[in-house]
UniProtKB/Swiss-Prot annotation:
Pathway(s) per entry: Amino-acid biosynthesis; L-tryptophan biosynthesis; L-tryptophan from chorismate: step 2/5
Catalytic activities: N-(5-phospho-beta-D-ribosyl)anthranilate + diphosphate = 5-phospho-alpha-D-ribose 1-diphosphate + anthranilate
Annotated binding of anthranilate 1, by residue: 88, 119
Cofactor requirements of the protein: Mg(2+)
Residues that, per the record, bind anthranilate 2: 174
Gene3D superfamilies, per database record: Nucleoside phosphorylase/phosphoribosyltransferase catalytic domain, Transferase, Pyrimidine Nucleoside Phosphorylase, Chain C
Pfam family, one: Glycos_trans_3N
Protein name from the UniProt record: Anthranilate phosphoribosyltransferase
Length: 347
């Protein structure tokens, strides 16, 4: 028996359930998000549903359903079984250098395949797509080339707008609402390569444990969800970082500090970035071996990624490997090789 698509009339009942404070089952939430992402809900219904969820508070089941639906509708690519994504929700309004993007390059240079998923900046000065474009990556590269880059170089960039065309049905309502909704959490949960390992940053600590559970439900083998004590959606070097790890079906929470990786504390102003061109220049300098607080935070995040991927026993070991990948020129070479495959066409 075929499943009938959820219609605009059907979603009314689901909106009413949420509006009265009732949590949706994963099946009911899937029906709602299937309607929304298929264009079978009106803008008013989408806005009403998203705000009802926001006011009541989104549940693990609802976030899982939304992310799974987004994954199902994505333009998929293949990545090696051990691939990791290093990604943040954005929304921390910190205006830092591009940390996860640089950490992804360093992690790949250490031999761990990275299926990097990201977008242009929403609340910051420079998103991962912005800085990579400034470095010479072609955001519109054929998806087969992105797949090839991951396979041959160990890293490729999946530009979210290329992979999630279903978001066109949600964009008008999100724009008119002008406030955070469940969709601000979904990007890092909807990796088009289905990476089974993930280092994910989030803009608020309240989401650290729930999103680790969501990643587990979505099939992650091991994942860290992190939030810096300074508000960063990254592992920070200005103080402690709260971590929820999903592994072996269990979520475990703990805090880490730069000292765990043998790194010094930084000041927030030392991590301030600028526009994509300036951030690209800083990233190039980092790959050349220039030692700054930016390098330290990138090494720390890469160290964590290596731990998550099973390529380092602990943060100190991971940090040493990450630093060596930079100092040997391997990380710089990784960027050059990626650009050789998915670089912007000559003008």
């Amino acid at each position: 028996m075929t499943t009938q698509p959820t219609t605009a009339n059907d979603i009314k009942g689901l909106i009413a359930m949420v509006a009265t404070g009732r949590p949706l089952s994963e099946a009911d939430a899937t029906r709602a998000f299937e309607a929304i992402m298929s264009g079978n809900a009106t803008p008013a219904q989408i806005g009403g549903f998203l705000m009802a969820l926001r006011v009541r508070g989104e549940t693990v089941a609802e976030i899982t359903a939304a992310a799974r639906t987004m994954r199902d509708k994505a333009a998929r690519i293949q990545a090696p079984a051990g691939a990791i994504d290093i990604v943040g929700t954005g929304g921390d309004c910190a205006g830092t250098y591009n940390i996860s993007t640089a950490a992804a390059l360093v992690t790949a240079a250490c031999g761990v395949p990275v299926a990097k998923h990201g977008n242009r900046a929403a609340s910051s000065k420079s998103g991962s797509a912005d800085v990579l474009a400034a470095l010479g990556v072609n955001l519109d590269a054929d998806l087969a080339l992105v797949e090839r880059s991951i396979a041959e170089v160990g890293i490729g960039f999946m530009f979210a707008q290329r992979h999630h065309s279903a978001m066109k049905h949600v964009a008008p309502a999100r724009s008119e609402l002008g406030t955070r909704t469940i969709f601000n959490l979904l990007g890092p949960l909807a990796n088009p390569a289905g990476a089974r390992f993930e280092l994910m940053g989030v803009f608020a600590q309240e989401w650290v444990e729930p999103l680790a559970e969501v990643l587990g439900r979505l099939g992650a083998e091991r994942a860290w969800v992190v939030h810096g004590s300074d508000g960063l959606d990254e592992i920070t070097t200005t103080g402690p970082t709260h971590v929820a790890e999903f592994r072996g079906g269990v979520v475990r929470s703990f805090d880490i500090t730069p000292a765990d990786a043998g790194l010094p504390l930084a000041k927030a102003e030392d991590l301030q970035g600028a526009d994509p061109e300036a951030n690209a220049q800083a990233l190039r300098a980092l790959l050349e071996g220039v030692k700054t607080p930016y390098r330290d935070i990138v090494v720390f995040n890469a160290a964590a990624a290596l731990v998550v991927a099973g390529a380092a026993e602990d943060l100190a070991t991971g940090a040493a490997r990450a630093a060596q990948a930079i100092d040997s020129g391997a990380a710089k070479d990784t960027l050059a090789r990626m650009i050789a495959i998915i670089g912007a066409p000559a003008s």
